[in-house]
Regions:
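N-terminal pre-catalytic "stem/leader" segment of glycosyltransferase-like enzymes
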Residues: 1-75, 217
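Nucleotide donor/acceptor-binding cores
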Residues: 13-15, 93, 187-191
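Conserved catalytic-core segment of nucleotide-activated headgroup transferases in glycan assembly
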Residues: 22-37, 162-228
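Active-site proximal beta-strand in glycosyltransferases
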Residues: 64-65, 85-108
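Short, flexible/disordered intra-domain loops and linkers
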Residues: 77-79, 107-118, 198-213
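Membrane-proximal helix-turn-helix segments that form the acceptor-binding/catalytic region
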Residues: 84, 116-137
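Acceptor-binding helix/loop patch of EC 2.4 sugar-transfer enzymes
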Residues: 97-124, 167, 172, 176, ...
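Donor nucleotide-sugar binding/catalytic pocket of nucleotide-sugar-dependent glycosyltransferases
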Residues: 132-149, 153-175, 190, 194
């Protein structure tokens, strides 16, 4: 009998796992949206979640395990266990540590409302050790790449910028609307800051000397010229 060929030959897709640290901005920009788009466009088979699975058979066929901002002792033990699994002959995955912010206490500004999460010296120690254990670290820009090379000694650090998903922003582009807005507001252009409240001294810890301190006077002087 002739060899039976499958009706549809599926292409080989790289398999990967994402372990999230959060489901908010960082989680979406760096993990969830890229995972969604890679799956939707058939570029890879990526699964994501927060449960660290202890059955090593689950990791067979996986090419990359990407962990986001892991820093606790339990998470360190999990990475050590993964490194032991990685060394076995049936496994060929790489472990990538994803970080898009500073997590070492000495470099986090005092006005940052979320600094308390990294005050414990154990957090610094465990996050440092995890980054040193990982095969690669991914960051958002060249500054952070150089920063973490200096801090951790891990030189295999890759810059992956943040990209806005087209399904979110692309449909809002309207050239006629842009021209209309320009004509309407050109006498007093609008300047908008879009970002986290962590850049502001919300709790007045250091008398408002935050990321906007150096431009406050400019804003005061130009409040009639620009709509801030």
């Amino acid at each position: 009998t002739p060899n039976k060929q499958p009706a549809h030959e599926l292409p080989h897709l790289p398999r990967a796992l994402n372990f999230y640290a959060d489901y908010s901005g960082c989680g979406h920009w760096r993990m969830i949206w890229p995972e969604l788009l890679l799956n939707c466009f058939g570029k890879a088979n990526v699964q994501g979640g927060t449960v660290m699975i202890g059955d090593k058979n689950f990791y067979k066929g996986i090419e990359t395990i990407r962990i986001q901002r892991q820093a606790t002792e339990q998470q360190l033990n999990y990475i050590k266990w993964l490194k032991n699994v990685q060394a076995e002959k049936d496994f060929n995955f790489r472990i990538v540590y994803e970080i898009d912010d500073l997590i070492f206490r000495e470099d986090i500004p005092d006005y940052n409302k979320f600094k308390f999460a990294f005050e414990d010296p154990k957090i610094r120690q465990t996050s440092m050790e995890i980054m040193q254990l990982c095969d690669e670290v991914s960051v958002t820009n060249e500054y952070m790449r150089n920063y973490y090379i200096e801090k951790t000694g891990n030189k295999n650090i890759t810059v992956i910028p943040n990209f806005i998903p087209r399904f979110w922003m692309d449909r809002f582009f309207d050239l006629d609307k842009i021209k209309e807005n320009f004509q309407r507001f050109k006498r007093k252009p609008r300047i908008v800051y879009c970002g986290s409240g962590a850049h502001f001294d919300i709790e007045n810890r250091i008398k408002q000397k935050d990321d906007f301190f150096h431009v406050n006077e400019v804003i005061r002087k130009t409040v009639d010229k620009f709509q801030w």
